[in-house]
Structures are given as C-alpha cells and as structure tokens.
C-alpha cells in the first residue's frame, strides 16, 4: 500500500506542478512505468485500463476539437453577445444569463470547453462595458464555477461522466434520464449561491450601446452555420445510435470531422492551430494515471473504501447518496477528480451494494467528482489551466481566495444536487 501510495502522490505532484513544462501525459507515464517496474501493477492490467479509458478520452478530444472550431468561427462570442442583450441593461439579469450560457456550453461542449473558451470572451465583453475589477472577477468566477456544477446532464458533459458511464455500462438515454433533472437542481442552486455571494459586486445597470453587434463576432459563416447542424446531429446520434452499440467517441468523431472539413475549406480558420490546441496528452495521461490508480486498487485501497461504502449502503438510499457524493468530492479536492472517479468506481464495484442503492452510488460518485474540484484549485486540471489563462489576462486569483470561495459555494450546491439525485431515484423504488 505504501509503495503504491508513494507512486500515486509523486505522479499527482508532477501532474499539478508540471516542472519545466513537463506535460501531464509524460508525468502520468512516468508514474505508470514506476508502477510496472515495481510490480504495483502488472502488464495484464494495461488492456483492462485501456478498455476503461479509450472511449472516454477519444470522445473528450472530439468534443474539444468541435468546441475549438466553433470558438474560432465566432460561435461562442456570438452567443455571449446575444445573451448580454437579453440582460436588457440590468446587471443581475446579465449575470444570470451569463451563468445560464455557461451551463448550456458545459452540457454540450464539456466543462473544460465552457471554462476555457467562455472566460476570455466574458472578460473582453466586461472590459468593453467598463466594469470594475471586482465585477469582472465576480462574472469570471461565476463562469468558472458553473462550468463544473452544470457538467452533469449528458455523458459527454465531463470526462468524468464518460469514464463512469463506460465503467458501469450506462447508456446515453439512461444516464440523461437520471441526471438532466439533477443538473437543473444544480444550476438553480448554483445561481442562488452565486447571486448571494457576489451580490455586492454585480452592478445595477450597464450600457448596452457599448456592446458590438453579435453578427460582427462571426468570422467563418460556413463553420458557424454547420456548427448548428453538427450539434443537432450529435444529440440525435447520441440518443439514437449509442443504444445500438456505436461508441459515443465514434459519433463525436464524425461530428468533429464534418466541422473540420468545412473549416478547412473556408480558409478563415487555422485548422492546424486547432489540432495543435487539442488535448492529445489526455490520451497517455488517462492510460498512465489510471494504471497508477489501478495500483492503489491492487494494494487494497479500493477494498477499504468498499467497506466504507457498505456501511453507507446499509443505511439506505439517502445515506448512500450523500455519503458517497461527499466522500468522492473530498477525495477529488485533494487528489484530483480524474483518479478519484476510477477509485470511486472500483470501490462501488467491489462493494455489496445492489439495485437502486448501487445506482445512487454510481451517480453520486459522478456528482462528487464533477463538483468536488471546485473546492480547491488542484481538484481538476481544467481549473489549473483556467487559472493560468486568467493570469495571462492580468487577473490573478490566489489559491487562498479560490479555496475560501470554493468551499462556501460548493458545499451547499453539492448537498442540493445530491438531495435531488436521491429524490429522483426515490421514484424508481
């Protein structure tokens, strides 16, 4: 256990610290090699882990490529400028619409896309409106927060969701039927908390005349228009084709290919830059990181956690839901959500829970790993990258400020979301 734990801690430190620009993929690979050399994992574990991660990572990359292409076409700026007009010059209404836009983008383009793509657009828009630094910080924090709390509804909304759905064989429709209503509760709770926390920083009014026309944001009309068609086809494909056995990654890849071909023909978008910007290292990161996590499983960590989950399961649906969700949220906040979701999945699989209790634990694990990272900056790689993007925009958020805000905001939203899950699953009893 000590050796497996030491390798895991070393890997996490390298992934978060990234000394001398060392990519997350190579850090995870180093951890995996150490685990193999020391016998913590065995060569036979490699195909097992690959079977867990391949569909998730491929789907995630395809969705991010679609997001990047649409961003280059002006799609997201166009949407942001439209919702800013729906605010009708009222600050609180603008704040609400920006949060709801972030929720929609997170649902369709994954949490990473929502946080990293929307943030620079929101900053530019707020600067154009002449908002203060405090107001800009409030809007930026809101955009970053909703990106994770609203990344629950669809399998493709978060890499965590895809990994868990693949592990437990959850279909797209089955997953959405449970998590869409839960996500609505999460969005409402997030909106309430954001308005309460940042109430002093949201301006009463703003001058809509300072905003440019949404049409001016469109840089590649062909890619912009095709994007709407691709989104519709993706949603239909996910709900219709995935139940027939076609992987989510294959459906997403076709959508990315169609959009890429259109963008390539238009010459307005640097498609080479888009491909270089795709998170290719996530492939070797997922395989390497999960091999290291599998070492923890081989060393008995997940067996210990299974015992904890058994106690929760014995106390009924609500205890299982709330207990699992808060446990995995805490683990995500201190050891990153990507390894945590697999630790949680392996522990649930090894527990004696069955029926609706096990189902509750599976979804609570997803919720904990989606929302838990908002407590600390190290909870997710997307948050670390988001903070880096902000620093490049001369907006530095200290880890202390992030933690204070994160823990106050996250715990109530997490509780409401888990309670919504327990209520939703109560109807299946």
Curated annotation (Swiss-Prot):
Cite the entry's keywords alphabetically: Arsenical resistance, Cell inner membrane, Cell membrane, Membrane, Transmembrane, Transmembrane helix, Transport
Membrane topology type, per the record? Multi-pass membrane protein
Upper lineage is: Bacteria, Pseudomonadati, Pseudomonadota, Gammaproteobacteria, Enterobacterales
Name the encoding gene, please.
arsB
Give the family, as the similarity comment puts it. Belongs to the ArsB family.
Q: Pfam families per the record? A: ArsB (PF02040)
The answer to whether the entry has keyword Nucleotide-binding is no
Membrane keyword on record: yes
GO terms of biological process kind:
antimonite transmembrane transport; arsenite transport; response to arsenic-containing substance
Q: Which locations, inside or outside the cell, does it occupy?
A: Cell inner membrane
Query: Which loops or segments lie on the Cytoplasmic side of the membrane, by the record?
Result: 1-20, 67-97, 142-151, 199-227, 270-273, 332-406
Q: Which domain of life is it from?
A: Bacteria
Query: What is the protein's known function?
Result: Involved in arsenical resistance. Thought to form the channel of an arsenite pump.
Q: Which InterPro entries match?
A: Arsenical_pump_ArsB
Q: Outline which residue ranges sit on the Periplasmic face.
A: 42-45, 119-120, 173-177, 295-310, 428-429
* Residue stretches spanning the membrane: 21-41, 46-66, 98-118, 121-141, 152-172, 178-198, 228-248, 249-269, 274-294, 311-331, 407-427
Organism from which the protein derives: Escherichia coli (strain K12)
Q: What is its main location?
A: membrane
Question: What are the record's GO terms for cellular component?
Answer: plasma membrane
Single GO MF annotation? antimonite secondary active transmembrane transporter activity
What is the protein name given in its UniProt record? Arsenical pump membrane protein
């Amino acid at each position: 256990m000590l050796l497996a734990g030491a390798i895991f801690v070393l890997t996490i430190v390298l992934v978060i610290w990234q000394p001398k620009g060392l990519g997350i993929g190579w850090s995870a690979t180093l951890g995996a090699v150490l685990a193999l050399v020391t016998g913590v994992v065995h060569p036979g574990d490699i195909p097992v882990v690959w079977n867990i991660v391949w569909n998730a990572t491929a789907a995630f990359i395809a969705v991010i490529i679609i997001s990047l292409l649409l961003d280059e076409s002006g799609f997201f700026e166009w949407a942001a400028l439209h919702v800013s007009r729906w605010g009708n010059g009222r600050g609180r209404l603008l704040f609400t619409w920006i949060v709801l836009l972030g929720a929609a983008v997170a649902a369709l383009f994954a949490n990473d896309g929502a946080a990293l793509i929307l943030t620079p657009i929101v900053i530019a828009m707020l600067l154009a409106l002449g908002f203060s630094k405090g107001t800009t910080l409030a809007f930026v924090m809101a955009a970053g927060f909703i990106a994770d709390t609203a990344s629950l509804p669809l399998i493709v909304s978060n890499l965590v969701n895809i990994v868990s759905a693949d592990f437990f064989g959850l279909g797209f429709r089955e997953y959405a039927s449970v998590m869409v209503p839960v996500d609505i509760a999460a969005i409402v709770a997030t909106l309430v908390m954001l308005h309460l926390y940042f109430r002093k920083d949201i301006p009463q009014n703003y001058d809509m005349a300072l905003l440019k026309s949404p049409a001016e944001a469109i840089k590649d009309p062909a890619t912009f228009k095709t994007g709407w068609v691709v989104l519709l086809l993706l949603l239909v494909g996910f709900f219709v084709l995935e139940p027939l056995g076609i992987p989510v990654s294959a459906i997403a890849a076709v959508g990315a290919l169609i959009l890429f071909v259109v963008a390539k023909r238009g010459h307005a978008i640097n498609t080479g830059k888009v491909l270089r910007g795709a998170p290719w290292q996530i492939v070797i990161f997922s395989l390497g990181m999960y091999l290291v996590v599998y070492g923890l499983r081989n060393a008995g960590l997940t067996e210990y956690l299974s015992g904890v989950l058994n106690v929760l399961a014995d106390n009924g649906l609500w205890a299982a839901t709330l207990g699992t969700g808060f446990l995995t949220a805490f683990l995500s906040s201190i050891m990153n959500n990507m390894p945590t979701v697999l630790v949680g999945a392996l522990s649930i699989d090894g527990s004696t829970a069955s029926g609706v209790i096990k189902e509750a634990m599976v979804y609570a694990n997803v919720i904990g790993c989606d929302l838990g990272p908002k407590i600390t900056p190290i909870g997710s790689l997307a948050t670390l990258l988001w903070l880096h993007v902000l620093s490049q925009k001369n907006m530095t958020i200290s880890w202390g400020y992030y933690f204070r805000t994160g823990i106050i905001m996250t715990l109530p939203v997490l509780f409401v979301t888990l309670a919504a899950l327990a209520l939703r699953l109560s109807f299946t009893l």
